[in-house]
Design a protein with these regions (language model features):
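Well-ordered beta-sheet/strand-loop patches within structured domains
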Residues: 1-248
């Protein structure tokens, strides 16, 4: 089954929403369509269906777990899965709202032939930190700060599909996908300061050079910001039915 969401036009039912364009977050018609493809991808994984093609986002998504997103765009990439069971399946989608939040629930119905179930193991191989860039501007009051671009931590992730029998015994563990997410720096605009404080040259009192006692800087153990984290195995999570509102 190929997830067909294009063309992203108002005539096709799409409204403007945040999306990614050349590494920037901008409002675009069809922005946020990846929330549907990502939720469908996760549902297909937990239904133990075959994944034909899937591509992760450039940045980690805040509405679904690492390695469980699937990006789609006009002209590609696409998301596609296959019903590799012996019976028909039905994909049901429901969109609901609660207060200011929107929720998407995708359910895949089929024929139960045994009590087996799926867990997805996520292994974070590397974490890539972001930095903060300060940009002075005349468009803000002196000292005023405004976040021009939000930040994303980068990750290198591998996911595995673990299938268990009804009594909890591991039947199979299969490599599912590699997902590489870039880091994006936070950009903060700061209003330029227009006031300068005059300094009094005054009189400088000479200091006695004397004897300088060296200080022991000690030994600092280097830290590895990119150390791998222990693998985490996820059961069918709550957000699979309630994809949060977000970008992409």
């Amino acid at each position: 089954m190929l997830f067909r969401s294009t063309p992203f036009t108002a005539a096709n039912g799409y409204s403007p929403a945040p999306g990614y364009l050349q590494g920037k977050t901008v409002d675009m018609v069809g922005g946020g369509a990846c929330q549907a493809s990502s939720t469908l991808y996760a549902a297909a994984l937990y239904a133990n269906l075959e994944i034909v093609q899937r591509t992760n986002h450039g940045f980690a998504s805040d509405y679904i777990g690492l390695g469980l997103d699937a990006t789609v765009a006009e002209g590609g990439p696409e998301f596609e899965f296959r019903n590799n069971t012996d019976y028909p399946i039905k994909v049901c989608a429901a969109y609901t709202t609660s207060g200011s939040k929107n929720y998407l629930k995708i359910t895949i119905l089929g024929t139960k032939v045994d009590d087996s179930y799926v867990k997805i193991k996520t292994e974070v191989l590397e974490t890539i930190p972001f930095t903060e860039e300060i940009v002075e501007t005349d468009e803000l009051a002196p000292g005023e700060r405004k976040v021009e671009q939000t930040a994303y931590t980068g990750y290198k992730v591998k996911t595995y599909r673990n299938v268990y029998s009804g009594d909890g015994k591991l039947i199979s563990s299969t490599f599912e996908a590699s997902s590489n997410y870039k880091a994006r720096n936070r950009i903060v605009l700061v209003g330029k300061s227009t006031a300068t404080t005059p300094t009094d040259p005054g009189t400088t009192v000479p200091t006695d050079p004397g004897t300088v006692t060296p200080t022991d800087p000690g030994v600092t153990a280097p830290t590895d910001p990119g150390a791998a984290e222990p693998p985490v195995e996820m059961e069918r999570p709550g957000w699979l039915d309630t994809g949060k509102e977000g970008e992409g």
